[in-house]
């Protein structure tokens, strides 16, 4: 019979054997990786004259000639990787020439076949490479695979590749539909994916803003965040009354950003929206774009029941120069609402600390009223900035 000690020794030997086997596998993988990198470096050196030829003739109108002679699978991938690297760097006719070379070398066709592989990893790599080559020939098979695929990493790689390869807005529209149909949060990724395309997507985004699919509407609003044109105002005003609070929030933010088109009364009226998230977004946007006419509305918002609305209102007031800071001081002294007073004091404290930190810079601005001097007008002489912690703060949620 085996004793407990024998069993323990046997167990230790088994563990050591497994550890040794695992270390051996890791060493083999590392060695294989080193060998592969050396082979790739050697092949890059071998085909350097061809790469020089491509660089010298990149601006010529004539198409590139494919490499002469048969290529091994590894040689094909090495050249393909170099071409994909250049495709990302170039634009216009130069990019089109490099993409045409990929098609002439049957690289696009090779990866199109890999899309139907039974192995997930091969599909992923093929989708990535097709996007890197930006060939219009890859759009249809990529979209077909998107229609079959469930939500996951491959779906997002396929969507990004479609965006890179698409030649028509209809193709991008189908891609957006397939990307956002699985999960509500995918509209965030969809808006980011659209940045990969070389097409002008503004007409597509305007179309999506009228769509019944809320995810497509959100995608369009996120993708249009940097635009404040007058042409968007009618659609945004309609979406500002949407039942979906996320759509309403995004639309209101964009309208506030384009505040020169709308009366300030309209903007400030959104501070009474039933959704606290939207009221907070409006309060935040008012400060970012410096609408001093909204100071009374922001002061009133300091009494809001939502902590984030009070926080962004106080922060926005602090961003509106002397007038905003005076309003904060007045709110801090008023006793009608403790939440308003505490939030105002908390923001005053942060602003004074910030001014103290940048004191040397502020001294260079001649004639400017510092927030410290305004503070002293309302609260008297402060002994030192670090001791201002005693003025309190709003910590209610």
Regions found by a protein language model. Name each.
Residues 85, 92-102, 124-134, 155-167, ...:
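Structural detector for internal amphipathic alpha-helices that build alpha-solenoid repeat scaffolds
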Residues 24-39, 143, 147-198, 203, ...:
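Long, contiguous interaction/recruitment modules in multidomain scaffold/adaptor proteins
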Residues 1-41:
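N-terminal signal-anchor transmembrane alpha helix of single-pass membrane proteins
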Residues 99-115, 135-147, 167-179, 199-210, ...:
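Amphipathic alpha-helical scaffolding segments comprising HEAT/armadillo-like alpha-solenoid repeats
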Residues 138-139, 143-146, 182, 246, ...:
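HEAT/HEAT-like alpha-solenoid repeats
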Residues 118-119, 149-154, 182-184, 212-214, ...:
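Short inter-helical turns and helix N-cap capping residues of alpha-solenoid HEAT/ARM repeat scaffolds
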Residues 31-116:
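N-terminal topogenic membrane-targeting module
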Residues 333-397:
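Eukaryotic acidic, Ser/Thr-rich intrinsically disordered low-complexity regions
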């Amino acid at each position: 019979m085996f004793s407990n000690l024998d069993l323990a020794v046997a167990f230790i030997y088994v563990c050591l054997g497994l550890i040794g086997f695992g270390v051996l596998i890791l060493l083999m993988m590392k060695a294989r990786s080193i060998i592969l990198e050396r082979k790739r470096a050697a092949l890059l050196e071998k085909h350097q004259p061809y790469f020089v030829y491509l660089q010298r003739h990149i601006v010529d109108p004539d198409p590139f000639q494919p490499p002469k002679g048969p290529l091994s699978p590894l040689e094909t991938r090495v050249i393909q990787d170099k071409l994909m690297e250049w495709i990302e760097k170039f634009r216009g006719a130069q990019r089109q020439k490099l993409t045409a070379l990929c098609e002439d070398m049957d690289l696009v066709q090779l990866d199109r076949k890999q899309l139907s592989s039974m192995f997930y990893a091969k599909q992923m790599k093929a989708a990535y490479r097709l996007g890197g080559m930006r060939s219009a020939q890859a759009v249809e098979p990529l979209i077909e695979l998107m229609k079959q695929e469930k939500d996951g990493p491959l779906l997002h790689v396929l969507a990004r590749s479609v965006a890179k390869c698409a030649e028509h807005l209809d193709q991008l529209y189908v891609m957006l539909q397939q990307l956002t149909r699985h999960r509500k949060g995918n509209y965030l990724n969809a808006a980011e994916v659209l940045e990969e395309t070389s097409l002008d997507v503004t007409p597509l985004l305007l179309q999506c803003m009228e769509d019944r699919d809320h995810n497509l509407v959100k995608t369009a609003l996120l993708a249009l965040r940097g635009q404040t044109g007058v042409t968007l105002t009618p659609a945004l005003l309609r979406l500002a009354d949407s039942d979906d609070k996320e759509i309403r929030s995004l639309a209101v933010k964009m309208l506030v950003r384009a505040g020169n088109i709308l009366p300030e009364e309209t903007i400030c009226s959104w501070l009474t929206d039933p959704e606290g998230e939207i009221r907070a977004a409006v309060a935040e946007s008012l400060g970012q774009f410096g609408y001093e006419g909204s100071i009374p509305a922001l002061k009133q918002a300091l009494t809001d029941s939502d902590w984030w609305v009070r926080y962004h209102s106080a922060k926005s007031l602090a961003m509106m120069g002397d007038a905003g800071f005076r309003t904060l001081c007045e709110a801090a002294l008023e006793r009608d609402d403790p939440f308003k007073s505490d939030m105002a004091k908390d923001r005053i404290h942060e602003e004074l600390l910030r001014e103290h930190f940048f004191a040397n810079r502020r001294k260079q601005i001649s004639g400017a009223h510092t927030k410290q001097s305004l503070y002293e007008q309302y609260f008297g002489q402060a002994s030192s900035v670090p001791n201002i912690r005693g003025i309190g703060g709003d910590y209610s949620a």
